[in-house]
């Protein structure tokens, strides 16, 4: 057997092995030092792939070198030997036919198996019979097959049971990593999630309907990754409290009654209908055409889960109402004097209907001056103001219909009589203050005048001449002579107001006023 060239002559190994080997040799760069080393590529190989043990910086002057399986140079473990002197390659006892030796000392092993995992030793001898022994190693791993998830409970009951899920990889479990996911999200240990050592088994405690899945188990080793098919749990639960739809509870005669009942349950619940507590139908839907007021009553949806043995009910009250009739509006007087009162009466045959008052096509805002009576049918406005003038209507409604009355226009006549209530409060206050000031001024002037009058009286009393000393005749040398002079004496008795008898009486003041009358 001749030594294979490092250039990999065609025909010595299969073409795919040549390509792989060439790529491996090209991808490996020798160590930066001149030290002889052995490296395996790849270090972790998938079963069936090729592995090459590359020798860097081969010794110069090598006379022979050989590869051995294991950490030994025993001839019993020899794979292949090359002797430079004879340029021959000699197969050893453990040669499998898959090994190829290259002139640079590298060893190619094709289609590796799990048994090929381990250490390989190269022994080199130079011309001076000096030996150099080096080792290299690699690991062979099985390509992972698709794993499968199994469960210890195929039909767990919500809130009662726990479930264990196991990931079966069908390959050697050594060097396998297990990862779990649910609905695409990774799972880790928590309050209700427990993982076994190595994560091969996932346990769910007290399962709920949200634990249904799907679950996926992912397996990994150094050479491959694989995923299981999605696995979902069939969790038994329910029924929940049923829901009856639609939400309408009022209908008018002649319409169709169509009810649907739904309750979350696994397996699906059984449905039963009762009308006024009497069994009617065993279906999820209830349909009654052309209903009348006789169809008013209680409608019950009864649901049952045969596996859990649980039952739930929901009751819905349905009322069939006749449409309301159009009301009529009356008023005591359509023309009202301002500040008077007015009463509007809504006449309706529908006593259980809702009353709504309309003012100028908008909702009437009920104020303090407005009162309603007889379930809102009578509206009284007292007192009425000019802003209350306008169009009034009443509206009658029930859950299935609405009617509006005729319109009445109310006129409010303005009262020409001054209404103090219409005067702004600021004006009233200003007038009151001005009046107080005016009265105070008048009182002050009266007091001042009275004081001056008393002073004048005192002056007259002190300076009046006596009757015996007064010259009654004019002076002869007076520039203006008068023919006759007449004098009169007026006595003024100052009258004091009546006082209580208990008060001491004061003397009356007597004053004499002289008046001169001249004749020309």
From Swiss-Prot:
Induction (UniProt): Levels in brain increase at fasting and decrease at 4 and 7 hours of refeeding.
Chain ranges on the Cytoplasmic side, renumbered to this chain: 444-520
Species the sequence originates in: Mus musculus (Mouse)
Keyword Membrane: yes
Renumbered residue ranges of the record's region Disordered: 457-520
Keywords: Cell membrane, Disulfide bond, Glycoprotein, Host-virus interaction, Immunoglobulin domain, Membrane, Phosphoprotein, Receptor, Repeat, Signal, Transmembrane, Transmembrane helix
Modified residues (Phosphotyrosine): 487, 514
Signal peptide: 1-34
Record PTM Phosphoserine, positions in chain: 502
Gene label: Ceacam2
Extracellular side: 35-422
Protein's name according to its UniProt entry: Cell adhesion molecule CEACAM2
Gene ablation phenotype (knockout): Sexually dimorphic effect. Homozygous null mutant female mice exhibit obesity that results from hyperphagia and reduced energy expenditure. Hyperphagia leads to peripheral insulin resistance. Insulin action is normal in liver but is compromised in skeletal muscle; the mice have incomplete fatty acid oxidation and impaired glucose uptake and disposal. Hyperphagia appears to result partly from increased hyperinsulinemia-induced hypothalamic fatty acid synthase levels and activity. Hyperinsulinemia is caused by increased insulin secretion.
Species lineage: Eukaryota, Metazoa, Chordata, Craniata, Vertebrata
Membrane topology according to the record: Single-pass type I membrane protein
Protein's GO biological process: energy homeostasis; negative regulation of brown fat cell proliferation; negative regulation of feeding behavior
Purpose of the protein: Controls energy balance and peripheral insulin action. Involved in the regulation of feeding behavior particularly in the ventromedial nucleus of hypothalamus (VMH) regulation of food intake. Has a role in the regulation of metabolic rate and insulin sensitivity or resistance via effects on brown adipogenesis, sympathetic nervous outflow to brown adipose tissue, spontaneous activity and energy expenditure in skeletal muscle. In case of murine coronavirus (MHV) infection, does probably not serve as functional receptor for the virus. Isoform 2 may be an adhesion molecule contributing to cell to cell adhesion between elongating spermatids and Sertoli cells within the seminiferous epithelium.
Transmembrane segments: 423-443
Major subcellular location class: membrane
């Amino acid at each position: 057997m001749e030594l294979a060239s490092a250039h990999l002559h065609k025909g010595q190994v299969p073409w795919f092995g040549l390509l792989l080997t060439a790529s491996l040799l090209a991808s490996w760069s020798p160590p930066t030092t001149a030290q002889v080393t052995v490296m395996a590529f790849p270090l972790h190989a998938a079963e069936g792939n090729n592995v090459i043990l590359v020798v860097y910086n081969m010794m110069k002057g090598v006379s022979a070198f050989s590869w051995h399986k294991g950490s030994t140079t025993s001839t019993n473990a020899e794979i292949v030997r090359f002797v430079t002197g004879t340029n021959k390659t000699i197969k050893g006892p453990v040669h499998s036919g898959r090994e190829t030796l290259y002139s640079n000392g590298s060893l190619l092993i094709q289609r590796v198996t799990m048994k090929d995992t381990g250490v390989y030793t190269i022994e080199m001898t130079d011309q001076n019979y000096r030996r150099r022994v080096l080792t290299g190693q690699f690991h062979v791993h099985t390509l992972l097959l698709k794993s499968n998830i199994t469960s210890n409970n195929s039909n767990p009951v919500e809130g009662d049971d726990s479930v264990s899920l196991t990931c079966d990889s069908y390959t050697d479990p050594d060097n396998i990593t297990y990862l779990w996911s649910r609905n695409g999200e990774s799972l880790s240990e928590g309050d209700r999630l427990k993982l076994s050592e190595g994560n091969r088994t996932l346990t769910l405690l007290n399962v709920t309907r949200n634990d249904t899945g799907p679950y996926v188990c992912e397996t990994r080793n150094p050479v491959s990754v694989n995923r299981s098919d999605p696995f979902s749990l069939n969790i038994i639960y329910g029924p929940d409290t049923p829901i009856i739809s639609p939400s309408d509870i009022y209908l008018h005669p002649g319409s169709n009654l169509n009810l649907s009942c739904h309750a979350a349950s696994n397996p699906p619940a059984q449905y039963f209908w009762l009308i006024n507590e009497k069994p009617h139908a065993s279906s999820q839907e209830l349909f009654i055409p052309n209903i009348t007021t006789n169809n008013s009553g209680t409608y019950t949806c009864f649901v049952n889960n045969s596996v859990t043995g649980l039952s739930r009910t929901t009751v819905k009250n349905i009322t069939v109402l006749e449409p309301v009739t159009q009301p009529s509006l009356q008023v005591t007087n359509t023309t009202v004097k301002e500040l008077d009162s007015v009463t509007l009466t809504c006449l309706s045959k529908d006593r259980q209907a809702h009353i709504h008052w309309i003012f100028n096509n908008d909702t009437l805002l009920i104020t303090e001056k407005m009162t309603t009576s007889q379930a809102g049918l009578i509206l009284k406005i007292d007192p009425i103001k000019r802003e209350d003038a306008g169009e009034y209507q009443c509206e009658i409604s029930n859950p299935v219909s609405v009617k509006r009355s005729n319109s009445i226009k109310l006129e409010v006549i303005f009262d020409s009589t001054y209404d103090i209530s219409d005067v702004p409060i600021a004006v009233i206050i200003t007038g009151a203050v001005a009046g107080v000031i005016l009265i105070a001024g008048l009182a002050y002037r009266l007091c001042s005048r009275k004081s001056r009058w008393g002073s004048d009286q005192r002056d007259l009393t002190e300076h009046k001449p006596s009757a015996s000393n007064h010259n009654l005749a004019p002076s002869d040398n007076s520039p203006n002579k008068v023919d006759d002079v007449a004098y009169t004496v007026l006595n003024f008795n100052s009258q004091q107001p009546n006082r209580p008898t208990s008060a001491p009486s004061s003397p009356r003041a007597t004053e004499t006023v002289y008046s001169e009358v001249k004749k020309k």
